[in-house]
Amino acid sequence: MVFQNYALYPHLTVEKNIRFPLENLKGAARLSKEEMKKRVMEAARMVQIEELMDRRPGELSGGQQQRVAIARALVKMPRVLLLDEPLSNLDARLRLKTREEIRRIQRATRITTVFVTHDQEEAMSISDQIAVMKEGVLQQTGRPQEVYDDPANLFTARFLGTPPINLFRGSIRNGALFIGTEAVLPAAGLSDQPVLAGIRPEGFLLHEQGPLSCGLENVEIMGRDISIVCSHPDCQTSPLRAIVSSESLSQLPSGTVRFALKPEKVLLFHPETEQRLRPRKEARNEQ
């Protein structure tokens, strides 16, 4: 297990910190000094800290300390490795680099690894399978992209995604999704009812005749994409953000901007239970 604060022994060298778990093995698991040295060097090579073996934790950077903690966990050759928010003490640039390192180590060792984090970007980028929890209750499991595209409830939809999902008060009427007075998408297979409509930032398309009209507040240039910051009276998240290609910048009007929506990026939820609303199968097949 690797803790958030690494829990290294400050008076021991890196080599002795890594070796410490092996010195406490009992019975048949006990190793000779030669076997311990070999195991320690293998773990150090795995996390690329061979040149730091004679240093003490106080002489190391945060990223180096984190790698020592991982080596100490790996040296026992565990069947399961638990990483409990191991990157939370690192700055943004080092977090990104160390995230890649952890992924490399996991692939090299093929040890089943449980990575605990409150950072959804870390969870999405590092995992093969993701488990979303709320107050100790499992909400959903699956591959990161699957959970992002098809969340089971509003909590999961809000947790995953940067910028976060935009949330609108809406209603289903006569087989269409209404936001305010505008019918923005077909909604066959759902009965007439109030809904919460979640729209991913990448789910907007600039369109002169688009059904969703918003007040333009700001445009943020992001290089390949632009973030359009808008307002809408029925939007419950502030600000409303739409991510579109930078090629669309020349199409932006002033004052009011109109959008068409990508149906696969619009998610409907029950306003009270916040569970996902899905059309009847027979209605989906008819479309």
Name each region found by the language model.
Residues A176-Q287:
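Non-catalytic connector elements of ABC transporters
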Residues Q4-F155:
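ABC ATPase nucleotide-binding domains
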Residues D149-I172, G198:
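C-terminal boundary and immediately downstream tail of ABC-type ATPase nucleotide-binding domains
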Residues D54, G161-N166, S191, M222-R224:
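Short flexible coil/turn linkers enriched for glycine and charged/polar residues
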Residues K97, D150, R158-F159, H207, ...:
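Residues that scaffold the ATP/ADP-binding catalytic core of kinase and kinase-like folds
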